[in-house]
Amino acid sequence: MTPTPNVRLSSLTFAIAAMLAFPVGLPAYADVSPSQVTALDMGDKPLKSPSASDYLERADVQAFLAEVHKTYKIPMAWLEDEVAVARYSETAERLMTPKARDPIVRKDTPKDKKVPKRDFSQYAKPFLSAERIARGQEFMARNKAVFDEIDKTHGVPRHVITAVIGVETMYGRNMGRYRVLDSLMTLSFDYTRRATFFKKELATFLDFCWRQEISPVTVLGSFAGAIGYGQFMPSSVDRWGLDGDKDGKIDLIGNEADAIASVANFLVAHGWTPGRGVLYTVTATEDIFEATGSGGIEAHTTVGDLAKAGVKLYDHFPLPEDEPVLLVDLPQRNAKGHLYTKWYLGTRNFSAILRYNRSYFYAAAVTLLADRIAKAPK
């Protein structure tokens, strides 16, 4: 799971490594969406020799495997047999390396101050296609029994869960074509910027495969190691993965019921509130955004406080004054190419989606797709 335009953040709790092609303060490895990456060319020359035996010969890898063996009680022979076939992935290291962004000058911005290119309407366009909406309805229809159960146990609307999976992988069509073992080995031992993080993911992945009786080399996913319909990183599978069809296994690659239950479980764990909306249109300014300390993912203020700060609410606004919210800015371009901003109040449900992917663009695209799926003719 998949990347942050205008969110001003620095940490990644749900590390799906989803990487949006828009600027913001995500960790360095969050630059490209897994679903986008699967279509990239893998034919470039590798930076290192992709010998299958290289990793097992390295002292740091042997030390790591010994620690995994000790911590998870996995036979050393199994670990060595599996890691012996791991190959260095130039693609994973290249795509994880951040690239400089091309700045532009806003019409109303001083000439000496540059702002990054950001256009939510362009970002959201492919996620709101007629095909993605229609496939979303099909996904809900064939999993009706599963969603009926999720309604009772979790209270997350089916169209929201469907939209997350639709944005992440087009309902399982683009789950990634990279060997997860190769990606995680490369990012653990050759990509030093995030080695500690990826070693934890690799250890969790090996433990999961051992317990589920899966050969790690057979698992395909994103270049960053995200897996399945919802693009969960291994630690997220371990923490929030659910056996949706009660068959005794958690399969987020081949089992839609497990994927649906796991996405719902994640959202609930991060504050999803049944019966509450997600985004509400308001009028605001950049000055208000800055003055109220906005820009994070938490609902850190209230409707009443933002109204006092100058945010204009529409008549018959449905949220109470003490409702926790955050101010959301979605920059985009008009027909003449000039930047302007649409403003919204996001509820704790918007924050829950942001914990899946710390990007206002991402969470808003999921929200819009969910709305289109719910309202489209059956």
Model-derived segments and spans:
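Acidic (Asp/Glu) carboxylate-rich active-site/surface patches
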Residues: I16
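Amphipathic alpha-helical interface segments
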Residues: S222-Y229, S236
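Short, conserved active-site entrance elements at the starts or edges of catalytic domains
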Residues: T204
